[in-house]
Regions:
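C-terminal segment of classical bacterial N-terminal signal peptides
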Residues: 13-20
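A general "mature secreted/periplasmic domain" signal
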Residues: 21-136
Length: 136
């Protein structure tokens, strides 16, 4: 019986670790302005971005990256545009309360986002940083 309880406890602990690992990450606020956000790239991570009606949000990747594809679930409630240079794009919500996912592919990495329009706490820019050895 003790062995069975130990197994159940270990299984529960392992499943909690998996759910935490799959959680979305909100990019951290910059030191000077909370609207400037920073996210460390992690393969397979989903990043949460908050947008606001009437405002654009930029997403900036490493200077050596070129965007090859931006795919969004809802292309009616959000507008997307490339930024010259190819390592950034902007998004702007057109519908209040809209939410979608966006997958971005570059010549080096893949990025996954959950984006929502909210009247509070809009991000002006999300800038990615890269761990050593990730090619960034």
């Amino acid at each position: 019986m003790k062995l069975a309880l130990g197994f159940v406890a270990a299984l529960a602990a392992a499943s909690m670790g998996v759910s935490e690992a799959l959680a979305e990450v909100t990019p951290r606020a910059g030191n000077l302005d909370a609207r400037v956000r920073y996210a460390q790239w992690v393969d397979g991570q989903v990043y949460r971005i908050q947008t606001q009606m009437g405002r654009v949000t930029s997403v900036e990747f490493g200077p050596d990256e070129q965007i090859t594809s931006v795919i969004a679930g809802d292309t009616v409630s959000f507008n997307f545009d490339a930024v010259p240079g190819g390592s950034a794009f902007v998004m702007k919500p057109t519908t209040s309360g809209a939410a979608t996912n966006i997958n971005v592919y570059t010549n080096k990495r893949q990025y996954y986002f959950e984006v929502s329009e909210t009247p509070a706490a809009q991000f002006s820019v999300v800038r990615f940083t890269y761990p050593r050895g990730s090619g960034g």
